[in-house]
Swiss-Prot record:
Main subcellular location of this protein, as a coarse class: membrane
UniProt cross-references to InterPro entries, sorted A to Z: ATP_synth_I (IPR005598)
Record's subcellular location: Cell membrane
Family: To M.tuberculosis Rv1303.
Transmembrane segments: 22-42, 43-63, 89-105, 112-130
Cleaved signal peptide residues: none
Organism annotation: Mycobacterium leprae (strain TN)
Protein name, entry field: Uncharacterized protein ML1138
Length: 153
């Protein structure tokens, strides 16, 4: 007998989630967005863009915490992870939309920041996995040579 998908145990691959790196990227992108928006006369769009990026990072950190707590259970279920994710995303989305509504033009920067952060998150977790598949190493740069020495790629 098979287990229904919603009751199946949660199995997560080991992925490289580096929140400090993402935070630094967020700060750099916020600075660039503020510079570009300031030059075009809409500095607050850049500020709200940075807020959106930081909300995305907060969401990613909350994902990590919830995954750790759910997988620490004796028999983690996908259903609890899905409900946790849906409620967290709903709260962050509503918060972003409230900001966008409260600040009619500049507040849309929050929505764009949230969207761009999701792209950054996917790329930052996909690239290490892709390197592992391509090069056969977790760190993606050090390979074993034919004589047993390490060669830097």
């Amino acid at each position: 007998m098979t287990t229904p998908a919603q009751d199946a145990p949660l199995v997560l691959p080991a992925v490289a989630f580096r929140p400090v790196r993402l935070f630094i990227i967020n700060i750099v992108l916020t600075g660039l967005a503020m510079l570009a928006a300031g030059l075009s006369g809409h500095l607050m769009v850049g500020v709200f863009f940075g807020i959106g990026l930081l909300l995305g990072l907060l969401n990613a950190l909350l994902v990590r915490c919830s995954v750790e707590s759910i997988t620490a259970q004796g028999h983690p279920l996908k259903r609890s992870m899905a409900l946790n994710s849906a409620s967290r995303l709903a709260i962050i989305t509503v918060f972003g939309l409230i900001i966008a509504y409260a600040f009619p033009l500049a507040g849309l920067g929050v929505v764009f920041g949230l969207a761009l952060f999701q792209v950054l998150l996917v790329l930052s977790t996909m690239l290490p996995v892709w390197r592992k598949f391509r090069f056969g190493e977790a760190d993606g740069g050090v390979l074993k040579g034919s004589e047993g020495e390490e060669q830097q790629r």
